[in-house]
Amino acid sequence: EQQRYLNAKKYVKLFLVADYIMYLKYGRNLTAVRTRMYDIDNVITPIYHRMNIHVALVGLEIWSNTDKIIVQSSADVTLDLFAKWRATDLLSRKSHDNAQLLTGINFNGPTAGLGYLGGICNTMYSAGIVQDHSKIHDLVAIAIAHEMGHNLGMDHDKDTCTCGTRPCIMAGALSCEASFLFSDCSQKDHQEFLIKNMPQCILKKPLKTDVVSPAVCGNYFVEVGEECDCGPPRTCRDPCCDAATCKLRQGAQCAEGLCCDQCRFKGAGTECRAAKDECDMADVCTGRSTECTDRFQRNGQPCKNNNGYCYNGKCPIMADQCIALFGPGATVSQDACFQFNREGNHYGYCRKEQNTKIACEPQDVKCGRLYCFPNSPENKNPCNIYYSPNDEDKGMVLPGTKCADGKACSNGQCVDVNTPY
């Protein structure tokens, strides 16, 4: 599973924000600020392409009336405020994986930016801030790539790290020289982070229509108006795609995709993805497109020796969820512990309505907080929950989990598996 995750193409749906000082700095000219940000995005894209990550700019916001947070010269305070604003305001308006604030303010000391280590896909911590510290947009783009690198699990380079001649992107200090490469250490950090955490949001490919930056032929991503994109003409080796126009060559039906072979659609019924497990199904080509549509067993089909029911292609059971939260020795707590879910507080509730925690009804107690027994020498408490104020949903029983014979959790209720849920 880890190898399949590592090999999968990754996509970071990026949202860029420019603050009010940026707007003033560029003469209150929205087009100038926008162009600056598009230019920066066009530098970030090829940097991450080398890491098998496509960065797609899915949102851009310029604070042209007033700042939506108090931007200040203390970088850590500003990052904290920006991350909270993203979590509570921006995410509810626009789906994205990572947000970066570009500011015209001068941060204290030598700091040009700040980002949370390993924050990608986290509601609270997938964010960074960067000072617009140079007229040369390449250098500012590299600073954003650096903070995104932190979010993607990369630490600062040590003296022994190398990427060729120049200092690399994750160097601890700013350089006047532009470096477009990650070091061997950064690549190792990133790979280890991916294996350990397997962040899911970056597996989802954005739609062409999600991208807000003007289409650029040669950036490896098929955008509106393009049929294919195999990168710059000097490096493209794709026989199906004309790199200069991003159009299919004469006679070609397709250039990429699991149902494309030698520029032609694979025949209808050709298997394009094997079934991963008992809740999945083998996927087949239609003969009319390159898409390999993911199909899975119907929700409610018994799985894992009748310990669970299939739900959206997975088999969620409490035992696995306890192990994921508390480690390999953990088991599900006794039924009595789940009665805490009738309290309607941080430690026990079934769902939230307008941020109010709703207590579980007696029949729904196994669809609220998950209670586990860690079974470790230092923790003999029989009723444990995982609780984090920054991510309250983590530690709740997952949707689709079996809560009784013939029943599964849906919206904090234990419902019959034969009803749609």
Curated annotation (Swiss-Prot):
Enzyme class: hydrolase
CDD domains: ZnMc_adamalysin_II_like (cd04269)
Location within or outside the cell: Secreted
Binding site for Zn(2+): H146, H150, H156
EC number: 3.4.24.-
Record's keyword annotation contains Repressor: no
GO terms assigned for molecular function: metal ion binding; metalloendopeptidase activity; toxin activity
Domain Peptidase M12B intervals: 10-206
Entry note: cofactor: Binds 1 zinc ion per subunit.
Cofactor needs: Zn(2+)
Active site location: E147
Keyword terms: Apoptosis, Calcium, Cell adhesion impairing toxin, Disulfide bond, Fibrinogenolytic toxin, Glycoprotein, Hemorrhagic toxin, Hemostasis impairing toxin, Hydrolase, Metal-binding, Metalloprotease, Protease, Secreted, Toxin, Zinc
Gene Ontology terms describing biological process: apoptotic process; proteolysis
Residues that coordinate or bind Ca(2+) 2: D280, M281, D283, D294, R295
The Disintegrin domain, residue ranges: 214-299
Subunit structure: Homodimer; disulfide-linked.
Family membership noted in the UniProt record: Belongs to the venom metalloproteinase (M12B) family. P-III subfamily. P-IIIc sub-subfamily.
Entry protein name: Zinc metalloproteinase-disintegrin-like crotastatin
Source organism per UniProt: Crotalus durissus terrificus (South American rattlesnake)
